[in-house]
UniProtKB/Swiss-Prot annotation:
Species in which this protein is naturally found: Pseudomonas savastanoi pv. phaseolicola (strain 1448A / Race 6) (Pseudomonas syringae pv. phaseolicola (strain 1448A / Race 6))
Assigned GO CC terms: plasma membrane
Keyword presence, Cell membrane: yes
Chief localization: membrane
Protein known as: Cytochrome c-type biogenesis protein CcmE
Length: 155
């Protein structure tokens, strides 16, 4: 093989190896940051993976909020009106968090079927509902409380 061709081949091989390594690192980083959304029905049916960060959303059941007297631990139940799932959270809940309203909790599902959340997001106003929660309620045949919901703008 000609030395010039050999040098070009080595350069091309090195570039391809570098691009492959960069793609592997980028996809690995993206995989760690992906949080798939699951409804309470999907979680109760075992579709959500254990010990993997997920987003769980639905309506907070009225009367389900339990606060610890001596810590910031909170426990509540979220429903899609078909099935329910318990969520635990340690921290201060958002000011807009209310029973009977939509939320999205980010956390991990444990072996007992409880979502241990490290972040809780509440809806912004009376008519706003997270798009995932709106879709989940529509799929379950339920309407959002208080009339129609306004989904977030896409784009």
């Amino acid at each position: 093989m000609n030395p010039l061709r050999k040098k070009r081949l080595l350069i091309i091989a090195a570039l391809l190896a570098g691009v492959g390594l960069a793609m592997t690192l980028a996809l690995g980083a993206l995989k760690e940051n992906i949080n798939l959304f699951y409804t309470p029905s999907q979680i109760a049916n075992g579709e959500a993976p254990l010990d993997t960060r997920i987003r769980a959303g639905g309506m907070v059941e009225k009367g389900s909020l339990q606060r610890s007297a001596d810590s910031l631990d909170v426990r509540f139940v979220v429903t899609d009106f078909n099935k329910s799932v318990t969520i635990t959270y340690r921290g201060i809940l958002p000011d807009l968090f209310r029973e009977g309203q939509g939320i999205v909790a980010l956390g991990k599902l444990n072996a007992q079927g409880v979502v241990v959340a490290d972040e809780v997001l509440a809806k912004h106003d009376e008519k706003y509902m997270p798009p995932e929660v709106t879709k989940a309620l529509r799929d379950s045949g339920q309407a959002a409380p208080g009339g129609s919901s306004t989904p977030a703008k896409q784009g």
